[in-house]
Amino acid sequence: MTDSPRETAAETATLLLHGARLTDGRTVDVRLSGPRIEAVGTAGSLAAGTPSGAADGTRIDLRGYLLLPAPAEPHAHLDQALTAGGPPAGDVEDVQRRATEGALLQLGHGATAVRSHVRIGDVQGLRSLEAVLQARQALRGLVDVHTVALPRLLTGSAGADGAAMLRDALKMGAAAVGGCPDLDPDPSGYTETVLSMAAEFGVPVDLHTAADDPARLARLAAMAGGMRPGVTLGPCHGLGALPATAVATAAARLAAAGISVAALPQGGCCVLDRRGTAPVRALRSAGVRVTAGSGALGDLTNPVGRGDPLEAAFLLASHGECRPPRAYDLVSGEARAVIGLPEVRVEAGFPAELLAVRGESLAGVLSLAYSRIVIHRGRVVSRTSAVREYCDSATEAVLDLPRQSHREA
């Protein structure tokens, strides 16, 4: 058993997770104190309550559950979430409501942090960003929302207005600079403005690109190489349509520049049409940091988009891009790293950002992830319980249940 130093002198209520299985096969107790894991020991070795025993804590029985670092969502569009049913009202209240509901849906699946791109400029101005920032505030303590300002044009006659609005967005509280150079008449000029603004405010960059033009991608990598706190490109689906030699060259350039890639195995997003998926295996083989996100959440791009990180990991594993442990890491550890969040391990001293899923192995969890318990900052913030029942086979004859089809004699 290992213990971590207490973060404060004040005693806080604890949460004991009893009998959880870890991915290495161990069955353990995990005691949480505030936002961190306080202790991990063999099953039955830990007690709930404060370290001095002055107060009782809460105990949750996790026998039959696999305990994992919680996923994070690295590429969402909460301002466009849940719009597949028709044109949204688009006012601040409507966007805030949908953004809140979308973030809660993703939290229910296990994501305790969400990076959301938010469109600015054109008709909506900064209203959508204002709404998502309000949703972020309302969700504090449940899920962490990180916003990326997504301007449309940054060059030409409209460029000055776009750059001014991007600056205002960062002053409002946007946590990163985004955009789509592919849709601007001057992609290099667009990228230069984004990188300059990000450097001025000291924020990361997260750009949309199909990555289907090797020359353009090479220029982007050269411009953004080595920038801190980091540059992410996504969904890079066009890379998958390029010849293998071109993919290898592009991947090597991205790796050398320290640029991460956010793939969207579940579908596209509202900025770029989907034409395939980023070649995750080839990118990772070249040393590129890759994460996987959801993209569209019930919008016109993907009306059935669910925002489930475990589904993204399932698709990566089932398509042969990664084995299950690595696929899960792409939606958890790698996603957190891309967003700029601290690492999570089921070990003492690490953040208490956890997901418990009924199952015994990662492969089983990715296949049948029904019942889930989500823990954020040491507190259970969501619980999903699924019950499957089958009728007794003998009952079928008594009730004369119909068959699936009837054939004429």
Residue positions per predicted region:
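Divalent metal-coordination and catalytic microenvironments
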Residues: 20, 35, 64, 75, ...
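His/Asp/Glu-enriched, well-ordered alpha-helical/loop segment
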Residues: 204, 228-229, 277-357
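Active-site core of metal-dependent hydrolases
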Residues: 151-157, 171-275
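Alpha-helical scaffold segments that flank or form the walls of functional sites
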Residues: 65-67, 71-73, 82-117, 122-140, ...
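Active-site microenvironment of metallo-dependent hydrolases
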Residues: 1-38, 46-50, 107, 314, ...
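Active-site mouth loops of central-metabolism enzymes
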Residues: 85-97, 146-160, 180-182
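Alpha-helix-loop-beta-strand connector modules within alpha/beta enzyme cores
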Residues: 126-148, 200-207, 226
